[in-house]
């Protein structure tokens, strides 16, 4: 049997918005190995830093892999569409210019609501008056607000950063009403943004001067993991990392990593970049050892310290805690955005999601995820905000399930899974008359009668962008695969075989959360072609794998819009809407 699995190497642009600004970040795809068994599975095994091995059942439930970015989106206008009162208004506003400010740098960031024209080249009033009247009417104002208005926050705008709405784009806004609570209300609020290009020489500013808002980083959809670039240290060094909702530590590969080819090892560390702490004037080594092991066999060990992390010019975290890895078999670092309980050191520290609030980049330790469709070039993670244009129906909030009375994993109850098969084209290999799966187990031909489905009994399930595939218990996976015929385990692929036609367009799985939210995922996300049988027929395996922990990875997450609130301990989900629109509202 010959197994073949090819993944394309793609590149795209990542976005960032902090406070009132938007920044574009370049990102690049990773190339995976062959077969489902070789996809990264970076579930931490235990904490080896302090010699204490926590039980796998207590200290696991995630796999690592997603990402971050860096770069700048330059723009000279505000562009967008605002919906309200049953209709929408498209707007594009060129920023006023002045002889006092020439060149491409645009207006500088400021915390002053009244912008100084001598410094920025235009005033706030100039900017507000440039926006069409229809926009202000939509949000309930008769005219543009001015710097002398001291009333409501219906339009508290500050021309302090970059914004845009065309793909790939992002925007930051201030809501006309209090931002959505952790329950992630689906009602939209008014929005606006300003446009500029940050200076190339921007340095991290103090937290007192930072504007609280929402920012997002666009992520490349590789179907294996997501990568982007961070700027680390002073002067900044660009290093690519993976972003993961299921882990909590940030670590970079050191230039001195013994496994790098340049140091006599076998790993091409230049591919994604390394961090040379000796070249950073702001690096501080706190003399704490760091070590972690993953289920895919990778290990990482090094030293914890602090330095400045820049998501885009002018938008940074000062003295961010992270590890510099001197010995690892991985070719790329990790950016975890989970609970501090998952940190691989005994003395817990303020990881980046919490540092973002601490340094006033966001008002709440919360972020939302939109990975877009399987074939999309990019998705994004939005820190401190919700993009109401990216889902359909209502966001439903679910309490995060604790582990041993602690908030450790970003997991919610999964009640059941059912299948809808509407396309039997090229169905083969089953006895005559048996192409249709078992009665009582699936939805037939698009009808809404489940007649059962697979009961998962509210299994606590991790929502993890760091996992390529998904995992359920062996019995649960076999029950789902059994919907499509005989259950056969493929030892080489470490997965269950499934008829390839199951992945035809129009077929889907429906995931039921507490009988309150139902997420439809195309079966094509779970049907993986890995080669051929001896007969020459195509061989496919199922992308929900047997495991000791329940995880919904990238092949599920592409179909859901998810808001992770690590303060109120809830995750809100809705069916993802694939479009180019944005309606960003900060979470307050």
Swiss-Prot record:
Residues 226-574 form the Peptidase A1 domain. It holds the Pfam family Asp. Residues 17-143 form a propeptide. InterPro entries: Aspartic_peptidase_A1, Aspartic_peptidase_AS, PEPTIDASE_A1, Peptidase_aspartic_dom_sf, SAP-like. Residues 160-175 have a biased composition (Polar residues). One of its GO terms (biological process) is fungal-type cell wall organization. Monomer. This is Secreted aspartic protease 7. It comes from Candida albicans (strain SC5314 / ATCC MYA-2876) (Yeast).
